[in-house]
Amino acid sequence: MKQYLDLEKYVLENGTQKGDRTGTGTISTFGYQMRFDLQEGFPIMTTKRVPFKLVVSELLWFLHGDTNIRYLLQHNNNIWNEWAFERFVKSDDYKGEDMTDFGLRAERDPAFKEVYQAEMEKFKTRILEDEAFANKYGELGNIYGKQWREWKTSQGETIDQLADLIEMIKTNPNSRRLIVSAWNPEDIPNMALPPCHSLFQFYVADGKLSCQLYQRSADIFLGVPFNIASYALLTHLIAREVGLEVGEFIHTMGDAHLYNNHIEQVKEQLSRTPHKLPKLVLSDKPATIFDFDVADISLDGYNPDPAIKAPISV
């Protein structure tokens, strides 16, 4: 997608070198927007392969209100492992090798990387096989799914923001309050990672449903391709339920950054030429957005260039 390649190029040429929480360092810009017409095809990277099934299982995890990585691991999805693992290795229950700054150390020290990978595999196995362990150390706190589906009020009640949103689109499509927020200041300290994609709003016009996402922190190379595909998929799922066509996905970013250890990968991607976008295929069986399974969602005509691997910063 040209819009995404333009973002990478813009940050490389105009970004500011900044330190960051992870210690990796970034090239960053503040305030950037991309627009995708969802009628022109499904917006997923074609200049590198994005594992679409992982996008699907993560979104369904959010939609279920789940915050435990066990569901993800059951679907061979490892994208949240590091944050749960970090909580475990900082606990008194962890008795293995020192895992301080495991992300950076694994990148720089091949011997440590082997030790880290072995500890991670043991952790994943315990999450899958030991329910009590999973309940304690698979939890990431009140992150996206919890805020979307069970926002706690000061009165001790809960708000299902997503169900309320869908009902409002059906009954009052001209509302300017078609908003879901994952940014709950009270819960931030207890989250494994505060919401990066923190608020989204829907808009209905001319029989089409559009979505705008505000993302406070955007990891351009690893995270943003997932975010684009995830919110485009969410827009399609909701549009199907409320009987509308899809319109645009607008992606607004606050701190949009390239990690310093992703620069060579970015240059490799910029050397590639975008291909035709695929089409999204949805099963007719699910009655509501909350009834979908991974097998109900697929892409037709997705023929991307090979994946480009890059380290994750935790």
From Swiss-Prot:
<feature type="binding site">
    <location>
        <begin position="176"/>
        <end position="177"/>
    </location>
    <ligand>
        <name>dUMP</name>
    </ligand>
</feature>
<feature type="active site" description="Nucleophile">
    <location>
        <position position="196"/>
    </location>
</feature>
<feature type="binding site" description="in other chain">
    <location>
        <position position="21"/>
    </location>
    <ligand>
        <name>dUMP</name>
    </ligand>
</feature>
<dbReference type="GO" id="GO:0006235">
    <property type="term" value="P:dTTP biosynthetic process"/>
</dbReference>
<feature type="binding site" description="in other chain">
    <location>
        <begin position="216"/>
        <end position="219"/>
    </location>
    <ligand>
        <name>dUMP</name>
    </ligand>
</feature>
<dbReference type="InterPro" id="IPR020940">
    <property type="entry name" value="Thymidylate_synthase_AS"/>
</dbReference>
<dbReference type="InterPro" id="IPR045097">
    <property type="entry name" value="Thymidate_synth/dCMP_Mease"/>
</dbReference>
<feature type="binding site" description="in other chain">
    <location>
        <position position="227"/>
    </location>
    <ligand>
        <name>dUMP</name>
    </ligand>
</feature>
<comment type="similarity">
    <text>Belongs to the thymidylate synthase family. Bacterial-type ThyA subfamily.</text>
</comment>
<keyword id="KW-0545">Nucleotide biosynthesis</keyword>
<keyword id="KW-0489">Methyltransferase</keyword>
<dbReference type="GO" id="GO:0005829">
    <property type="term" value="C:cytosol"/>
</dbReference>
<dbReference type="InterPro" id="IPR000398">
    <property type="entry name" value="Thymidylate_synthase"/>
</dbReference>
<comment type="function">
    <text>Catalyzes the reductive methylation of 2'-deoxyuridine-5'-monophosphate (dUMP) to 2'-deoxythymidine-5'-monophosphate (dTMP) while utilizing 5,10-methylenetetrahydrofolate (mTHF) as the methyl donor and reductant in the reaction, yielding dihydrofolate (DHF) as a by-product. This enzymatic reaction provides an intracellular de novo source of dTMP, an essential precursor for DNA biosynthesis.</text>
</comment>
<dbReference type="GO" id="GO:0004799">
    <property type="term" value="F:thymidylate synthase activity"/>
</dbReference>
<feature type="binding site">
    <location>
        <position position="313"/>
    </location>
    <ligand>
        <name>(6R)-5,10-methylene-5,6,7,8-tetrahydrofolate</name>
    </ligand>
</feature>
<keyword id="KW-0963">Cytoplasm</keyword>
<protein>
    <recommendedName>
        <fullName>Thymidylate synthase</fullName>
        <ecNumber>2.1.1.45</ecNumber>
    </recommendedName>
</protein>
<dbReference type="GO" id="GO:0006231">
    <property type="term" value="P:dTMP biosynthetic process"/>
</dbReference>
<dbReference type="Pfam" id="PF00303">
    <property type="entry name" value="Thymidylat_synt"/>
</dbReference>
<dbReference type="InterPro" id="IPR036926">
    <property type="entry name" value="Thymidate_synth/dCMP_Mease_sf"/>
</dbReference>
<comment type="subunit">
    <text>Homodimer.</text>
</comment>
<dbReference type="GO" id="GO:0032259">
    <property type="term" value="P:methylation"/>
</dbReference>
<dbReference type="InterPro" id="IPR023451">
    <property type="entry name" value="Thymidate_synth/dCMP_Mease_dom"/>
</dbReference>
<feature type="binding site" description="in other chain">
    <location>
        <begin position="257"/>
        <end position="259"/>
    </location>
    <ligand>
        <name>dUMP</name>
    </ligand>
</feature>
<keyword id="KW-0808">Transferase</keyword>
<feature type="binding site">
    <location>
        <position position="219"/>
    </location>
    <ligand>
        <name>(6R)-5,10-methylene-5,6,7,8-tetrahydrofolate</name>
    </ligand>
</feature>
<comment type="pathway">
    <text>Pyrimidine metabolism; dTTP biosynthesis.</text>
</comment>
